[in-house]
Amino acid sequence: MGDKPLPSSFDDNPDFFQDNPWKKLGRRLKEEPLVPLGIGATCYALFRAYRSMKMGDSVQVNRMFRARIYAQAFTLLAVCAGSVYYKTERDQRKQLEKAMDLKKQQTKRDAWLKELEIRDQEDKDWQSRHAAIEQAAKGAELKPLGTDPAPETAERDQAEEPAAKEPGEGSGGGVLSAVKNLTWGSK
């Protein structure tokens, strides 16, 4: 369970992905323009060798195969020179990408933790409401039904009762009224 990433509602958010492949290809072509040139020269030499072979010109075929080898050597030199030339820039880019990834992971984690805190608070609120309802229900069950209250308190309760009652409310003080008082407040 420790290896799995934390679930979040932000997992499918496309804002967390930045560089698409076409932008990356364009950037690489701008960084090392000699590599595509060498690849193009190699392909052209192979094409010319194929055409010369179809025509039966063996001298031209050999010349084009040599040109293909030179073009491939040029491409390899361009790749090596570009890697040496852009090494520090690539290292800086990798460090920047790592920092951005860490920042993205931190924001995702913070959002997930905030979401968990909200859910936890909702659970605590629900549990406290549920406990209050249970307390009210237990209080209503523990109330003795056969005993008469003292005459003075009975008169006072009867005087306050018409003001406290609402139309449609039952005359009993059971569980239903306790739940209504909890959810709608004591009126």
From Swiss-Prot:
The chain crosses the membrane at residues 33-49, 64-86. Gene3D superfamilies: 6.10.140.1320. Pfam families: HIG_1_N. The keyword Ion transport does not apply. It is found in: Mitochondrion membrane. The gene is RCF1. Residues 86-109 form a coiled coil. Cytochrome c oxidase subunit which plays a role in assembly of respiratory supercomplexes. It comes from Arthroderma otae (strain ATCC MYA-4605 / CBS 113480) (Microsporum canis). Its main location: mitochondrion. Belongs to the RCF1 family. This is Respiratory supercomplex factor 1, mitochondrial. The lineage of its organism: Eukaryota, Fungi, Dikarya, Ascomycota, Pezizomycotina. It comes from the Eukaryota. Residues 136-187 are annotated as: Disordered. The keyword Secreted does not apply. InterPro entries: Hypoxia_induced_domain (IPR007667), RCF1 (IPR050355). One of its GO terms (biological process) is mitochondrial respirasome assembly.
